[in-house]
């Protein structure tokens, strides 16, 4: 499987490689700000409950903007939407670098692109994943999505350690007199990487605008069929012959599947929102009094651990099918999350549980992408991925409010338990709704 990964990497089209570079820079940028956002807000005298509200409003704004941008991305132009997103990243970074005004920061956090954690925000993820689906055949998707997840996670890891080293260097050299000045310079670096990402988006070819209305030609692949839970099928890429297919409406079959997906992903994201990586940084900073370099090193290691799990995730998906693969990795991840606060007085054990959590938490990314791209009709894929990611972000909006309140009352540790419990619940719902399609998707993935 590993050699096959390298073959897919080497043989990938120029556009897919550019998309990999894009997700690398984006997650690197989010990794930078993830290390300092909660500490920055605390440094400008925001209370913990107010920080939680700030994060929730940021995510709520992302829901609204992402909904509009992803829903109309196909008609407005995917590349144009991605370039706009990069511009908003750049502006947000500049505002956070030069302002301490709560209202101004909140406006640019809501309408710009600032990640309250190292997770995805903005319209990028759903549009890029839809592009990859339309640029790659079914039998190559597990490896291509695994590489996509891998480079993103590596970017996030590098962002964490770069931030730690950068802040430590600023303090040692005297270039920044206070922690707050260091945090502002980190946001300036974020703006620079946003500009680099914008350049990459401008280099994408016209092929990234193609979708399910066009034939996918691959001399080694038979025409693949998307699966739905009712066993209905449709060609992977075909010419649209009915005006309804060119409209912005989803088919009835797609809406039925989408409702089930939303329940699963929103419960999962509700759990994730209770303890984002931004709050994890805050937890270790306050609970164990860790400095910037130590925090950067810790989350660099956790992100590397998470990155190393993305390749095995494609192997597990091929062997067991996407649904069983998700269950095998996500239930242990939830359990490890619950165990983290049990070691709140013993740092080495806490770090062990944290790394075990990160080792399993991202292993469901590839299986879930495979599930989505196999049960959704190609012409609906961009919109469905957009709605799913928006639903996930909306669900994540709820958690930070309660996290802030709990943190303000010295119960931040409880959020680990709530988070893990909700993730396990989402996995059980997934098993009930989609376990039956595993065998067919597995067969389609392993077709040569």
Swiss-Prot record:
- The residues the record assigns to binding ATP are 386-393
Keyword Transcription applies: no
Q: Which UniProt keywords apply?
A: ATP-binding, Membrane, Nucleotide-binding, Transmembrane, Transmembrane helix
User: PROSITE patterns per the record?
Assistant: MFS (PS50850)
The places in or outside the cell where this protein is found are: Membrane
From the UniProt record, which GO molecular function terms apply? ATP binding; transmembrane transporter activity
Q: Which residue stretches are annotated as topological domain Cytoplasmic?
A: 72-93, 168-184, 282-287, 355-386, 438-448
Q: Which PANTHER family match?
A: ABR173CP (PTHR23520:SF2), TRANSPORTER, PUTATIVE (AFU_ORTHOLOGUE AFUA_3G04000)-RELATED (PTHR23520)
Q: What is this protein called?
A: Uncharacterized membrane protein YJR124C
Q: Which organism is it from?
A: Saccharomyces cerevisiae (strain ATCC 204508 / S288c)
